[in-house]
Amino acid sequence: MSELSDRMGVERDFARRLSRLTARQRRELREKLGTPPDVTRVTAVDWARWEDERRQELTLILLAVILATYRQHVVELVGEQPDDATAAAAYREAVVKAAAMAAESAGSSISTARDIVMAAADVLRTGTAADVESVLVSALGPERDAVTAATATTQAQTAGTVAARLPVEAAGFNMVTRWVTEQDSKVCPLCRPLNGKVPDLWGLVLENALAPGGSRAAASVVANGGPPAHPNCRCYLRTTREPQARRVRVPG
């Protein structure tokens, strides 16, 4: 029914865990570049390895967030955990979702890091030590990790909420979701009009949004089943349950 318990604490732990990996990869990148730094010393194999490491770490983090959100919603809406078969089905779905999200995020992050490094080849070769470090932190650094953690926590929270639909329906209820924004000045003009809206209205609201990026956000929201609508999105889904309609058999 509510946002993931201690959502901001979960996000902070996510960012710290990811930053530990990123710091090690940045150190390895610095060593690979050599002295003076030369981007040709960093091979495609190196970038692929860093992407795979990031994918594996993200999969574990995201799976934990998805399952925590799922369990919270099931307890709030049903009052107890589902039977073994339903729980196993939800777990399989969570594993698949976490792996897909992690692969997309890791691929995007490392591709961007590589582009930054390659574009700064001249700066790396001729710049000061401070210049080199600035490029490396821009490519693999805590600021980008913080954005990843915020966005991916929201995405995983949505996945866990959506996964709760199966046990809720198995218990004889329909699960109704509504978009919820944070009630503060940081809410973006894309998400503000979505507050309180059910899924059938999300696409229409975003397609007609006055803020730029509405169509792109609509496609993302449909694919996710909810937030995030953009990087750093902090929105979530509020869930309620209602009795399933019963079909009355008319004697023939």
Where are these regions (language model features)?
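N-terminal leader/targeting and assembly helices and adjacent pre-domain segments
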Residues: 1-167, 172, 240-252
